[in-house]
Amino acid sequence: MVIVGFPGDPVDTVILPGGAGVDAARSEPALIDWVKAVSGTARRVVTVCTGAFLAAEAGLLGRTPSDDALGLCRTFRPRISGRSGRCRPDLHAQFAEGVDRGWSHRRHRPRAGTGRRRPRHRDCPDGCPLARPVSAPTRWADPVRGSGVDATRQTDLDPPGAGGHRGRAGGAHRIGELAQRAAMSPRHFTRVFSDEVGEAPGRYVERIRTEAARRQLEETHDTVVAIAARCGFGTAETMRRSFIRRVGISPDQYRKAFA
């Protein structure tokens, strides 16, 4: 690891990426000292996936609520509290539990810093839109263009919200129906699904519905009631409770911040 130097002026945003090299990076005292020094004067610190471990090693988190990091959150505890999928534009420290969530932060951080009225696309080498759907990280997930994932490897175990079902997030995806579709008993289906995805089917469905509702809040002028019905929540109150659990703010607050 080579430390080029310290910036002459305070930086606005420090981004700590994750990946396979995080464990080695955490053992580099010079790097950790650099992160501490630069983050101390930055307006915000953003971590992507296991980059949160760098922030933890540098002592930046304290009791900050942090995202799940795909099941690795338990290693933070007890010093750092963990909650999955929270989006807090007002926090100094921002967390992204994976690469896809990191793209979401990439989109929202410039808007939070310079105002809401920003284009939904930016010039970048891969031409990526700033508005990007979030998918699960396993065979249950959508194939991602350019990721090397072969769409033909998708199986009959695909849950609602993944692959061809993503457009039907509002369907009645009950455990019994999903298990029957996968030719499994409900108990076995729940166990296999949880092992591969890292969360129970019911929580996965709620997450997919929440992501679908987030996109509609950002991209349409439909009412919260209409979006809740379309995304499978049934009522606006059910959708509000889901947003509070997963996003940390209500649908109305989310729309005001990101639409």
Swiss-Prot record:
Residues 174-257 form the HTH araC/xylS-type domain. One of its GO terms (molecular function) is DNA-binding transcription factor activity. Residues 104-170 are annotated as: Disordered. Residues 104-121 have a biased composition (Basic residues). GO terms for biological process: regulation of DNA-templated transcription. Disruption phenotype: Cells lacking this gene exhibit reduced survival both in macrophages and in a mouse infection model. GO terms for cellular component: plasma membrane. Induction: Repressed by Mce3R. Controls the expression of genes important for virulence. This is HTH-type transcriptional regulator Rv1931c. It comes from Mycobacterium tuberculosis (strain ATCC 25618 / H37Rv). The lineage of its organism: Bacteria, Bacillati, Actinomycetota, Actinomycetes, Mycobacteriales.
